[in-house]
Amino acid sequence: MDEMDNVIRSLEQEYRLILLLNHRNKNQHRAASWYGSFNEMKRNCGQIITLFSSRRLQAKRLKDVEWVKLHRLLQRALFRQLKRWYWQFNGVIALGQFVTLGCTLVTLLANVRALYMRLWEINETEFIRCGCLIKNLPRTKAKSVVNDVEELGEIIDEDIGNNVQENELVITSIPKPLTENCKKKKKRKKKNKSAIDGIFG
């Protein structure tokens, strides 16, 4: 649990930096596309911190429902949203106008990802216990058991499927569309153009 507390304290520190960055940039950048990803990261991190702060203040274990919620938040962030967040923040650097802001965002994202992965590893047994993860059992090689009494069938010759001759192939013709049902377009005569039409088009 000591390692868990260290990870939570580090995550709280990163969350404070995220909040400062949010407060500093929300008026100027709130319409930018990367800001939506930043806001998602802020909310996700805030929800995880809220789960753990209640546990630490009351010195209790998390309930199963809270473990499931933590698993859902970590899984969504790590395996679905993280790549999109990275590309959005990297786009800020690529624009060249706010390079320091982009570098700060990518650094925060890297730190948050490392802490999320650490939380995932530490709490893996709890996730398995709650049924969020399936424990990977070592696979044993399945030995094929052949019962001598049971009939396995007859051996099929490989040439059975190749007995089709060219004469047996049937060529089907494509039916032609009926011309009676189709409407015929009437040809219009071109109007005689005058000299003025030739000039003005």
From Swiss-Prot:
GO biological process: maturation of 5.8S rRNA; maturation of 5.8S rRNA from tricistronic rRNA transcript (SSU-rRNA, 5.8S rRNA, LSU-rRNA); nuclear-transcribed mRNA catabolic process, RNase MRP-dependent
Pfam families: RMP1 (PF20945)
InterPro entries: RMP1 (IPR047205), RMP1_RBD (IPR047204)
GO molecular function, one term: rRNA primary transcript binding
Keyword field contains rRNA processing: yes
Annotated function: Functions as part of ribonuclease MRP (RNase MRP), which is involved in rRNA processing in mitochondria.
Note: Present with 556 molecules/cell in log phase SD medium.
Record text on subunit structure and interactions: Component of RNase MRP complex which consists of an RNA moiety and at least 10 protein subunits including POP1, POP3, POP4, POP5, POP6, POP7, POP8, RMP1, RPP1 and SNM1, many of which are shared with the RNase P complex.
Protein's name in the database: Ribonuclease MRP protein subunit RMP1
Organism: Saccharomyces cerevisiae (strain ATCC 204508 / S288c)
